[in-house]
Amino acid sequence: MPKETFFRLPLEKRYLIEDVAIQEFAENSLQSASVNAIVNNAGIAKGSFYQYFENMEDLYKHVLKLIKDRKMELISTLPLPANNLDTFRYLQRLLQIDLAFELKHPLLAKVERRHNFENPVTSSIDPETGQRLSGDGRFHAFLSQGVFHDDIATWVDTDLAAYVLGVVSRWLSPYLLERMEQDSGKPVEVNLDISLDPHLQDLLQNLMDLLMAGMARDPQIRKDFYSK
């Protein structure tokens, strides 16, 4: 993480360095990103860079933390549902958060996609059991709760499903934005209230129908889907 000297900088200068770094990492991997490009675009001396950060990886980790922080900020802005969420409604809310992040912070979203592409999460370790799991560990807990609450069928391979949901969560947002622009013929507004946009909600609902048809415990849900 950055050195204390970085956090003592005036906010305007600190934000400038962060913005320049985000632009650099949006277009380049950690290995190919240039310290020279960052210091030149930020208007700082190269020696100052190393007063603020240990190395380029230190700055990169700081940008990844910014991504997490911005997502946490977005969670508080989306309206809470009136009732408790079932497994699939909870997943829909998570996807809305990802989409809001893509819309409001496109460069940070691009950094995150590049990071995920270059560092694919093919497995994770369960902190309680030590068991190696496929994909993002967050979805294993999510799916286990779904099975426990009878939202998800017991025959579902949660290891495989967790991996698939991880892939969906990382790459769905840019597709949805592009799809909305194609369908409407105009750019999506940055301040769009995604929770109220009917076209977007229709697309998300269709995705939920697909997932429910494959994983829901209630066989009637699958029957209804395939009869459409």
What are these regions (language model features)?
Residues 63-93, 110-113, 145:
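Amphipathic alpha-helical linker/stalk segments
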Residues 77-105, 158, 162-165, 201:
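Hydrophobic alpha-helical connector segments
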Residues 16, 27-58, 62:
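Helix-turn-helix
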Residues 141-149, 167, 171-228:
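C-terminal peripheral helix-coil segments that are non-catalytic and often amphipathic
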Residues 13-21, 38, 63-71, 139:
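Generic hydrophobic, amphipathic alpha-helix propensity
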Residues 1-12, 219-228:
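N-terminal intrinsically disordered/low-complexity leader segments
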Residues 69-72, 89, 121-151, 159-163, ...:
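Amphipathic alpha-helical packing segments from all-alpha helical-bundle domains
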Residues 90, 101-123, 177-187:
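Amphipathic alpha-helical segments used for helix-helix packing
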